[in-house]
């Protein structure tokens, strides 16, 4: 699975028991900010709850060996955390963890989890984890090279879509002959 930042901003957030609220894209952002409400287009999130989510991400990172991780490796650790601590069961992350399905999030810092990792690195300036997107792209390309056939399941567009589609080209640049992906499913909200 290749996804955008929504995997953290929505799935992890809701697995912790928090909710998103339907709002309006026309609301005054300054007024929302005064009330500590974040707006993602027409969806509202309580900033206090979002910061709890960020602190949980920091806590997960604090308990890992300080080294470079791919987003897949870190999301797997989030899944492990949710297995023990989720309020709302059967989130996408927890289900992927249970079934050993890799989730790649190439724009990881575009999510609120990026704030959690900044807090983690600030607390641990010399010994912290990092998310290595190049290592991640190489890992996904190696999966493509080893596969007998592949299909794509994409949540969102932009970076994750390009990221997973480009594994064919990257494999070719590494001197490997691979087939194109056999199918693609994309879930997105297009205006």
Question: What spans do the regions from the language model cover?
Answer:
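Conserved catalytic alpha/beta core of Sir2/sirtuin-type deacylases, generalized to analogous enzyme cores
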Residues: 1-191
């Amino acid at each position: 699975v290749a996804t955008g930042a929504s995997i953290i901003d929505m799935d992890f957030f809701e697995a912790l028991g928090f909710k998103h609220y339907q709002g309006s894209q026309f609301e005054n952002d300054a007024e929302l900010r005064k009330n500590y409400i974040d707006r993602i287009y027409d969806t509202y999130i309580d900033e206090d709850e979002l910061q709890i989510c960020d602190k949980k991400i920091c806590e997960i990172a604090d308990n890992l060996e300080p080294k470079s991780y791919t987003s897949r490796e870190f999301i797997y650790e989030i899944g492990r955390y949710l297995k023990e601590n989720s309020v709302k069961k059967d989130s996408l992350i927890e289900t992927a963890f249970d079934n050993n399905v890799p989730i790649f999030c190439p724009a990881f810092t575009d999510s609120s989890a990026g704030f959690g990792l900044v807090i983690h690195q600030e607390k641990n300036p010399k010994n912290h984890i990092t998310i290595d997107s190049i290592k991640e792209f190489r890992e996904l390309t190696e999966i493509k090279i080893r596969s007998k056939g592949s299909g794509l399941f994409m949540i969102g567009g932009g970076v994750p879509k390009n990221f997973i589609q480009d594994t064919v080209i990257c494999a070719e640049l590494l001197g490997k002959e691979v087939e194109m992906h056999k199918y693609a499913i994309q879930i997105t909200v297009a205006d």
